[in-house]
């Protein structure tokens, strides 16, 4: 048995101080953090998906600016920092501010009151938030004689959650008032760092702070959040060995599975280093289990606000393209679905050519989560109605139980092509392909639609751990099961997969031409 009992992983811990004092494993980013704090620009903005380590980064910066040298013993920063100046820090965590103007005001009032007490600011009863913020910055400087570090974490949380509600404009107005102060207080500020997921350019953070440097795409900061493959192999060997032992894998097989599930993020066209989702990776290694941790933590809750009719569009996103100007500078509310999906972590950079980014799904966890999210809207059924059937379909495909798998598939697609009016613009076979590929993706299979081979185009290839399913679909009024069977035999659709170690199963499937569902199937 691999011993990992003496190693603590920082599951659910966002405090750098707590990570260090409890002796938790810490992936050392302090050399990059020191460069950002000392060699970067004064005003910095970093966008990364939710649960990607932004808050730990902000907390580490706070500990650094507060001069807490003891927390950094043994880390890379000790070779770089010589002075350890303790300076005043103003930190705001806007994820605690709710999604209504009243809750935003309440949070700012409470946060400012704490800072006013610390820096002995006399507050007039009629003072606006902008005046109070200005006075806090000046008082912190005057009391210490040192310029202030200002850290604003998850700045966009109230704006994102209030988007497309009556509260959004009022929340935006508060932001314009308060954060315009940052520019006028330049001489009192040492370093300003703002994190978020999505970019709302109409607020004063971006319109007033014309010197705000968006470091989100800079190559030197590509891995400032998240965990690289090199760091995984260096820091997590005992946990990977334990996972391998539990699952009956070799070490390399365990790494390959972790990579397929949680790796694949890229944040700079000039530094395409692979980055793992840290939340999912650390949870998976702590549990010795591969699950959809990031998605199940609420990651998909904002999708309906930003992506209309997503159930019809998912296949268009992998791959998709977006102009450099759009992805690097545009407001999320006007940049299209691709921009939101990139900023929030559902798409990542796959390549770059002549001013155009190529985007795609980063990994299996994200892809499955997206398809799982849209399946109820596509099938016109609730999650509760289809989850049991989905589970049975997945198990049947894993075991090669064709009769049970086709029974489940028939139940899931019954009447859907006919009943879902959003599909009306598609021809009937196209509707079936969309519905079936969404179902297979949602249960975690690897799916290729209309796969080209030397002899023709296969309607669908569905892969599980033990099986490769080659599907040919035919409508009842287009020859049905007999035509599908004949085409598979003549064109030898299963032949290119025979070298695969997995069992290859060729399936001819007949579908009702009126959209009522699966009529018949046959193993070829």
Predicted segment positions?
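Domain-level recognition of nuclease-like catalytic cores that cleave nucleotide substrates
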Residues: 496, 500-524
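Metal-dependent nuclease catalytic cores in nucleic-acid-processing enzymes
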Residues: 178-185, 339-347, 437-442, 487-507
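Mg2+/Mn2+-dependent nuclease catalytic core
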Residues: 169-175, 475-494
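Phosphate-binding site recognition
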Residues: 1-428, 443-445
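Structural motif
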Residues: 149, 467-469, 505
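Conserved catalytic cores of phosphodiester-cleaving nucleases, focusing on short active-site segments
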Residues: 436, 460-462, 466-477, 491
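Active-site metal-binding core of divalent-cation-utilizing nuclease and nuclease-like domains
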Residues: 140-144, 439-465
